[in-house]
């Protein structure tokens, strides 16, 4: 195997969107073209019992939303495609944020009837901060939506990114006739037996259609006043190519996939803590754990650490360093994914995502290296939780299951765990309410441990250095606790309590996470 050639083939990207914009449906269609599934199931399959391939966890199937990031891989057109499907629900920003650290590009799915929505904006900010390319898919053209020019304007005004339309819709909703493909210089037809026609046939096909006249006017306007196409600007994350289509009816998706693969970047390097960048073509293997997922196979109560390979080649059975602990590990039981199904892998290269069977060795953010290399990659972001719950086992006899469940789910990073310094009570912190619901559901469903959860409301959280800690600092306005790494942390009732504490102890440094 020529490793350099293999690395060049890799295209690793995440799909981001607001809930219900059609992210899971487009993922399905891409897998369909990759030959991974025989028919694209859609999330609407709640009534029929056919669930989307990427929404594999029980609670996702019930709700029709993605709450974990799943990884899928397929080959298409000489490229090895790795898709990371991110949670579309706003409460799962931490997991999503980390996933976006492991990709080289992002596909942003927008509901053409709703335009840019809150969660899309939030996720886009993360992608923009990383400076990776964004490809936009304006979805649901089979329904009535906003004017295409207005949608492009929203990209520029709300997200602050220039856009270039790769194709243009001819009509919408019931009047939808197809796409005027500017990049490939052809028409893509929504109805009839023929899929494509030449631009010269446009007047013959749509001559009397008022929408087609509008399309020609719009394109003339774009040619005169629109942005210029620039591959350089796309790769720099300064220009987003825009594709129109309908994931549900599988229209425009294959054209999108083929064009995307032409312009999406090869695997990029990753920054170490000393600021140096590790090149994907370095011969030495390196990677980082961006996610840990328990119970991908509930029958075996397993846990998988998801690793983005940054450089070199993984070979089954290889020994790696874990600089965080100073110890080593052997990578013998390693898999690659198709949502819930997986297969053992013997080789993988930079750009690939592998799953390492984990018995408690790894943490999110861990760096893996080989040989004398003991460096670490820059730390992954963590979020400061905003709402808290006290949590305990409903049945004292189930304490063992309770502790195992908490330990595993907390290591995934979906909730954060704190322990009251004085009472030893467990407290959970989260960004949003849904995280608690998912935690409770999974504790009961996967660990057979019913839990009692009591709301503590919102808190303002600050970490302090262990050497600054004095237990007398604890008062009725705060709770002194330890996080899961045994670091001291204060949970303040409100901002007033925080300011009061800061005034009383001016020499104590209070640290806030992201």
From Swiss-Prot:
It comes from the Bacteria. One of its GO terms (biological process) is regulation of translational termination. Keywords: Cytoplasm, GTP-binding, Nucleotide-binding, Protein biosynthesis. It is found in: Cytoplasm. Coiled coil: none annotated. GO terms for cellular component: cytosol. Residues 8-268 form the tr-type G domain. GTP binds at residues 17-24, 85-89, 139-142. Its main location: cytoplasm. HAMAP family: Rel_fac_3 (MF_00072). Increases the formation of ribosomal termination complexes and stimulates activities of RF-1 and RF-2. It binds guanine nucleotides and has strong preference for UGA stop codons. It may interact directly with the ribosome. The stimulation of RF-1 and RF-2 is significantly reduced by GTP and GDP, but not by GMP. Belongs to the TRAFAC class translation factor GTPase superfamily. Classic translation factor GTPase family. PrfC subfamily. This is Peptide chain release factor 3. It comes from Streptococcus pneumoniae serotype 4 (strain ATCC BAA-334 / TIGR4). The gene is prfC.
